[in-house]
Amino acid sequence: MRSLIIVLLFPSIIYSMSIRRCEKTEEETWGLKIGLCIIAKDFYPERTDCSVHRPTASGGLITEGNGFRVVIYDQCTEPHDFIITDTQQTRLGSSHTYIKFSNMNTGVPSSIPKCSRTLCISVYCDQEAGDIKFEEYTQESSDISIRVKYDSSCIDYLGINQSFMNECIRRITTWDRESCVRIDTQTINKYLKSCTNTKFDRNVYKRYILKSKALHAKTEL
């Protein structure tokens, strides 16, 4: 019986030794990551640099590059800081593009207005005109809501990787992983490049934001 007790206790000792307690700063540091895995349909996206078009105080941005234009905005009506601070892109293989939006110091979700955590995303093919046939995809949780519409006439597949968690959970979890069909996290992170902020043009920004809002206002696609 004594040997049996020792055998049962030994794994728990190893487990307690291998798990490091979370620091207070890890528990208080929250970060948001949204990854779009896009596969082109009937065309090969050109590998390009990417750009970001955003105002200084408004809840939205436009990014272009690697074959696609993406418009993302929140539901707030008053001037404020947009929840997304960083944008990265890469083209993977001949037809895959990965776009990552992030902010690794958002603050606790409960401290952020719900309108800032309610995001609409529109994905267009930048290099191909397409027939503008849109499909919709939605992800919702208690912390964030994401609604995506994309042009399925030139996009064969669109997947979303989304995580909104503190650094403590991010360190120990196994499901906070980015992927793009069969392309793994390490490969994606190896080739991701930060997008360059372009000189702000209010007319260009307004045109694409209004176009995207009109698209999301439609109840039928």
Curated annotation (Swiss-Prot):
It holds the Pfam family Pox_T4_C. InterPro entries: Apoptosis_reg_M-T4 (IPR016399), M-T4_sf (IPR038687), Poxvirus_T4p_C (IPR007579), Poxvirus_T4p_N (IPR007580). Gene3D superfamilies: 2.60.240.30. Induction: Expressed in the intermediate phase of the viral replicative cycle. Transmembrane segments: none annotated. Belongs to the orthopoxvirus OPG195 protein family. This is Protein OPG195. It comes from Monkeypox virus.
